[in-house]
């Protein structure tokens, strides 16, 4: 995964370049999480649009990319930013099957409005209700969350659906500490 990418990006590019230098005819990237896609516009004066910058760099050393459920807020496809073939794997069917098989009376919870598309699809496939929390993002690492009407969640097992597991875990720990 390319979560927390600053420490991983250059070693990844070096490894791809070394593979080609050592004789690889094709070098493909399989990354469950593609970094920097959230920065798809300038949110503050002087910021880089890192989704485009990172895509340009990756496209110079890899011949193709496979990823899972990328953040495509203002892009319609990865092809808008990557110059190599891309393939997106949808996680909803596997997650829904697991929830349906292992959780009694689930209610799926998305941490923010951006997660609604995934949560709604997992809920549909699992035959479960869902709700989405309201996230207030004040900065890259400064985020607040408001809980929905908890009466609708009574008698159900909550299942948090998030595309970035560390963020989901952080939210869970915050809720446990608050209760």
Locations of the language-model features?
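PRPP-associated nucleotide enzymes
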Residues: 1-179
């Amino acid at each position: 995964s390319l979560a927390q990418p600053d420490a991983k990006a250059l070693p990844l590019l070096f490894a791809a370049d070394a593979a080609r230098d050592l004789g690889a005819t094709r070098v493909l990237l399989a990354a469950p999480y593609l970094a920097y896609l959230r920065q798809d516009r300038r949110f503050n004066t002087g910021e880089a649009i890192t989704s485009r910058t990172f895509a340009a760099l990756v496209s110079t050393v890899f011949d193709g990319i496979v990823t899972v459920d990328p953040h495509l807020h203002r892009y319609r496809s990865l092809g808008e930013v990557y110059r190599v073939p891309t393939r997106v794997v949808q996680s909803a069917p596997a997650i829904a099957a697991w929830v349906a098989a292992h959780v009694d009376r689930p209610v799926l919870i998305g941490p923010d409005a951006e997660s609604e598309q995934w949560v709604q699809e997992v809920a549909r496939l699992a035959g479960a209700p869902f709700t989405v929390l309201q996230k207030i993002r004040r900065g890259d690492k400064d985020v607040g969350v408001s809980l929905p009407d908890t009466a609708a969640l009574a008698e159900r097992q909550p299942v948090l659906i998030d595309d970035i597991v560390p963020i989901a875990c952080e939210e869970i720990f915050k809720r446990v500490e608050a209760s």
